[in-house]
Amino acid sequence: MLVWLAEHLVKYYSGFNVFSYLTFRAIVSLLTALFISLWMGPRMIARLQKLSFGQVVRNDGPESHFSKRGTPTMGGIMILTAIVISVLLWAYPSNPYVWCVLVVLIGYGIIGFVDDYRKVVRKDTKGLIARWKYFWMSVIALGVAFALYLVGKDTPATQLVVPFFKDVMPQLGLFYILLSYFVIVGTGNAVNLTDGLDGLAIMPTVFVAAGFALVAWATGNMNFANYLHIPYLRHAGELVIVCTAIVGAGLGFLWFNTYPAQVFMGDVGSLALGGALGIIAVLLRQEFLLVIMGGVFVVETLSVILQVGSFKLRGQRIFRMAPIHHHYELKGWPEPRVIVRFWIISLMLVLIGLATLKVR
């Protein structure tokens, strides 16, 4: 929005030309989202407390979590608000990739909001019925994937980028829709599963978004894309603005979500952020890179799948509790230790993922 305004004002004052620089807009996008999130935090927490929108804690969870009962939840609303406002201010409104991310972000946020509302208002620990949650998540993911396929059919936008192999970029055809669906829905659920400890999900989300900001910048720059042997996508550059907005909003939220948390993001935050990371990976053609950089989310999800599968097939559990962060809690690790170690692992995986772009 401000970019368009600056384009009209630059003829009166050349200084407005700074708004055309992607790096400048990326920085101010981060700062805008950060300040909005910090400003909204105390007000959102007070409002949630007044409405008695407190966290519902399962009785079969770790005993250390019982003290979290009643902590305000649905704080993801302030994350999404900060991201959307920042993106609308600093990204080019005509960019289709930006709107794809916003559709998934807001759509998944609405699904998460309904889920949270049922939990905190109706006191239903199960929230939105699973089949309806997956149905609406699938509708959004398939709708966006199908639209992208129609527009990008038989172009680099529907190729599969394989790490370590610079000349292996097969056209996916209709499989593009299926892959995109699983990436978007899967990442949404993976971040949702990871959001079980104070600050555990938000910091890896920030790390991955920061990593994708660098990838988006390279993908939208023809020279760097050719140098790294990745597809050049002319709309990809504006995703830098989206990614830095996620970073800023996430850091602002972490101010209030760090241990001991004053507020939880709820499904309205975790589903939306996960879906956003998924669609960003799809748009950048970096689904494999998401698996590497988002390794913490992958492991958390696999721990649940293995736990459920093992119990159904053998009647035995592999972990003391799943997702795996609860396993370490029950082993006696203090919650802050689990959180920070997972953060360290996440940062390492993002750096490893970025390194794979050059190792080809």
From Swiss-Prot:
Pathway(s) per entry: Cell wall biogenesis; peptidoglycan biosynthesis
Keyword Ribonucleoprotein set for record: no
Disulfide bonds: none
Cellular component terms per the entry's GO annotation: plasma membrane
GO terms for MF: metal ion binding; phospho-N-acetylmuramoyl-pentapeptide-transferase activity; UDP-N-acetylmuramoyl-L-alanyl-D-glutamyl-meso-2,6-diaminopimelyl-D-alanyl-D-alanine:undecaprenyl-phosphate transferase activity
Localisation per UniProt entry: Cell inner membrane
Membrane-spanning ranges: 26-46, 72-92, 94-114, 132-152, 168-188, 199-219, 236-256, 263-283, 288-308, 338-358
Membrane topology value: Multi-pass membrane protein
Keywords, comma-separated and alphabetical: Cell cycle, Cell division, Cell inner membrane, Cell membrane, Cell shape, Cell wall biogenesis/degradation, Magnesium, Membrane, Metal-binding, Peptidoglycan synthesis, Transferase, Transmembrane, Transmembrane helix
Tagged with keyword Cell wall biogenesis/degradation: yes
Cytoplasmic topological domain: 47-71, 115-131, 189-198, 257-262, 309-337
Reaction catalysed by this enzyme: UDP-N-acetyl-alpha-D-muramoyl-L-alanyl-gamma-D-glutamyl-meso-2,6-diaminopimeloyl-D-alanyl-D-alanine + di-trans,octa-cis-undecaprenyl phosphate = di-trans,octa-cis-undecaprenyl diphospho-N-acetyl-alpha-D-muramoyl-L-alanyl-D-glutamyl-meso-2,6-diaminopimeloyl-D-alanyl-D-alanine + UMP
Major localisation: membrane
One BP term from GO: cell wall organization
CDD domains: GT_MraY (cd06852)
Similarity annotation: Belongs to the glycosyltransferase 4 family. MraY subfamily.
NCBIfam families tied to this protein: mraY
HAMAP family: MraY (MF_00038)
Functional summary from the UniProt entry: Catalyzes the initial step of the lipid cycle reactions in the biosynthesis of the cell wall peptidoglycan: transfers peptidoglycan precursor phospho-MurNAc-pentapeptide from UDP-MurNAc-pentapeptide onto the lipid carrier undecaprenyl phosphate, yielding undecaprenyl-pyrophosphoryl-MurNAc-pentapeptide, known as lipid I.
Name recorded for this polypeptide: Phospho-N-acetylmuramoyl-pentapeptide-transferase
Organism name: Salmonella arizonae (strain ATCC BAA-731 / CDC346-86 / RSK2980)
